[in-house]
């Protein structure tokens, strides 16, 4: 199942990415779920087929990578390409095993550009 990690210290660019993702979903009332917790509701959403569209999208907002561990474990066990999951995380530690589970194409980092020359 496609999963992507999105983080950075530039909130404008992170929000722009989040808004772009929202606009890409056909029939968002059925195929888009944005949440900050992972419960039975989110699991049921992930296991349903997309309605009136070709894919579903889960946007998970978290403060730290630790909050994403349960989500990533569940996604790794699923065998479906119908759901794309985007994990928006405020603080990321690149040294963790969890971070290393994401492939190079699955990580989007948005940082402020320094003006020093």
Describe every region a protein language model picked out.
Residues 2-117:
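Non-catalytic interfacial helical region
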